[in-house]
Swiss-Prot record:
A motif (TOS motif) lies at residues 28-32. Coiled coil: none annotated. It is an enzyme of class 2 (transferase). Serine/threonine-protein kinase that acts downstream of mTOR signaling in response to growth factors and nutrients to promote cell proliferation, cell growth and cell cycle progression. Regulates protein synthesis through phosphorylation of EIF4B, RPS6 and EEF2K, and contributes to cell survival by repressing the pro-apoptotic function of BAD. Under conditions of nutrient depletion, the inactive form associates with the EIF3 translation initiation complex. Its EC number is 2.7.11.1. The gene is RPS6KB1. One of its GO terms (biological process) is apoptotic process. Residues 424-525 are annotated as: Autoinhibitory domain. This is Ribosomal protein S6 kinase beta-1. It comes from Oryctolagus cuniculus (Rabbit). Residues 353-423 form the AGC-kinase C-terminal domain. Interacts with PPP1R9A/neurabin-1. Interacts with RPTOR. Interacts with IRS1. Interacts with EIF3B and EIF3C. Interacts with TRAF4. Interacts with POLDIP3. Interacts (via N-terminus) with IER5. The lineage of its organism: Eukaryota, Metazoa, Chordata, Craniata, Vertebrata. Phosphorylation at Thr-412 is regulated by mTORC1. The phosphorylation at this site is maintained by an agonist-dependent autophosphorylation mechanism. Activated by phosphorylation at Thr-252 by PDPK1. Dephosphorylation by PPP1CC at Thr-412 in mitochondrion. InterPro entries: AGC-kinase_C, Kinase-like_dom_sf, Pkinase_C, Prot_kinase_dom, Protein_kinase_ATP_BS, Ribosomal_S6_kinase, Ser/Thr_kinase_AS.
């Protein structure tokens, strides 16, 4: 699935990574690391002054959710007492959704225990490839921990995480609507009401992440999936930055060039305001057919982002033009959303004046595009280049050293929704309530990531309680995490309901056009 700039890698690998890898479907970026080929600081800054001063002021304070969550004591014997022990054999491979340098993503059906018969997406990562690079290990850690920590209607759900001797497995909800990238490629541009719907849902997801102290940093059409109803789901959390609160800044160079905020390119420190720049770049892309600043190569693209004037087509409404100008401000401190109100500032803009935010959060607003699906296993919204391949999870014959396996202690996870059904079946007794704790950032801008074997995965087993020589036998573990009440939406994470045949044909919401995107950003349909 590729469009204007589909990166090599599963669901887009960010532009700063240049690995030769296959395309993968947007919720699961496999290529975790690529060389930082952004050019020198001199290259970034040469050629004149910026149009606006690069003032990277602090972020205003905002409240962090530290809800108390009920915990259950989970052990090897309690979770796997009767029906199952989560492992690859619990899942039947159905289709290949994508693949990259570090593994594959499959559509699978659970064939044992809880959730039997339900359809999921299974992301498989090779340990031997990941442990070669501290940054890749940190990216994997961040993605797994954030997916456990965050539960929101517009963010992909992690159902299980487990491991074998040589592989890591993430079981995620299957998002049969495919990537927003695909819809943009088919349509060319979106009408403003269509773009407004998607941007509104995305803003709610970003706001929730920011409340948790998480900067997303990789917002682009390939990382925005659609569920069976057409609602947004943010995916691919490998580039997220954790524990960014109250004016804290980070310096890591990461993201996709065309959607990257100037302060990231300048490496002068950035905060959550970078996500609002990316939202503005995405909005511009939706309404015009291409990101706001593109060049013949990376150097020229960066130069344009830092110095060129924003050109707005005359057909845009005044509200759209005003929002774009306020989101795409090079001065991060004056950017809309950079203040204490964060997402609230963006959502209060007149462009969103027709949005009922409560109904939107409850997913009661009808999406502009609803995928035509024949069954819950439908893969029509994914690239046939992969879906027609025979799904095979290669034999797990690799062996890591004892010290290398220490990194993956505590990777195992079972979603609270699954544990609740297990709890009822086996009469678990509730333990004391304990506040969720936030773990530190997995990356540092100066020195390589250093691992603490006992607590690398944050919520995992310690070295003193697990046998590092037998990672396949790690017990199921979980911690209390926030539960979103989405019962009003009438929607379950998986399996995805089959669309009713009388729901009508798909109605186009935008005018198709010849793509203005650079060749490397296009998708050949």
């Amino acid at each position: 699935m590729r469009r204007r700039r589909r990166r090599d890698g599963f669901y887009p690998a960010p532009d700063f990574r240049d690995r030769e890898a296959e395309d993968m479907a947007g919720v699961f970026d496999i290529d975790l690391d690529q060389p930082e080929d952004a050019g020198s600081e001199d290259e970034l800054e040469e050629g004149g002054q910026l149009n606006e001063s690069m003032d990277h002021g602090g972020v205003g304070p905002y409240e962090l959710g530290m809800e108390h969550c009920e915990k259950f004591e989970i052990s090897e014997t309690s979770v796997n007492r009767g029906p199952e022990k989560i492992r690859p054999e619990c899942f039947e491979l159905l289709r290949v959704l994508g693949k990259g340098g570090y593994g594959k993503v499959f559509q699978v059906r659970k064939v044992t225990g809880a959730n039997t018969g339900k359809i999921f997406a299974m992301k498989v990562l090779k340990k031997a490839m990941i442990v070669r690079n501290a940054k890749d290990t940190a990216h994997t850690k961040a993605e797994r921990n954030i997916l456990e920590e965050v539960k929101h209607p517009f963010i992909v759900d992690l159902i299980y995480a487990f491991q074998t001797g040589g592989k890591l497995y993430l079981i995620l909800e299957y998002l049969s609507g495919g990537e927003l990238f695909m819809q943009l490629e088919r349509e060319g541009i979106f009408m403003e009401d269509t773009a407004c719907f998607y941007l509104a849902e995305i803003s709610m997801a970003l706001g929730h992440l920011h409340q948790k102290g998480i900067i997303y940093r990789d917002l682009k059409p390939e990382n925005i999936m659609l569920n069976h109803q057409g609602h947004v789901k943010l995916t691919d959390f490998g580039l997220c930055k954790e524990s960014i609160h109250d004016g804290t800044v980070t310096h890591t160079f990461c993201g996709t060039i065309e959607y990257m905020a100037p302060e990231i390119l300048m490496r002068s420190g950035h905060n959550r305001a970078v996500d609002w720049w990316s939202l503005g770049a995405l909005m511009y892309d939706m309404l015009t057919g291409a990101p706001p600043f593109t060049g013949e190569n990376r150097k020229k693209t960066i130069d344009k982002i830092l110095k060129c004037k924003l050109n707005l087509p005359p057909y845009l409404t005044q509200e759209a033009r005003d929002l774009l100008k306020k989101l795409l401000k090079r001065n991060a401190a004056s950017r809309l959303g950079a203040g204490p109100g964060d997402a609230g500032e963006v959502q209060a803009h007149p462009f969103f004046r027709h949005i009922n935010w409560e109904e939107l959060l409850a997913r009661k607003v009808e999406p502009p595009f609803k995928p035509l699906l024949q069954s819950e296993e439908d893969v029509s919204q994914f690239d046939s280049k992969f879906t027609r391949q025979t799904p095979v999870d290669s034999p797990d014959d690799s062996t890591l050293s004892e010290s290398a396996n220490q990194v993956f202690l505590g990777f195992t996870y079972v979603a609270p929704s699954v544990l609740e059904s297990v709890k009822e079946k086996f009469s678990f007794e509730p333990k004391i309530r304990s506040p969720r704790r936030f773990i530190g950032s997995p990356r540092t801008p100066v020195s390589p990531v250093k691992f603490s074997p006992g607590d690398f995965w944050g919520r995992g087993a310690s070295a003193s309680t697990a046998n590092p020589q037998t990672p396949v036998e790690y017990p199921m573990e979980t911690s209390g995490i926030e539960q979103m009440d989405v019962t009003t939406s009438g929607e379950a994470s998986a399996p995805l309901p089959i669309r009713q045949p009388n729901s009508g044909p798909y109605k186009k919401q935008a005018f198709p056009m010849i793509s203005k995107r650079p060749e490397h950003l296009r998708m050949n349909l």
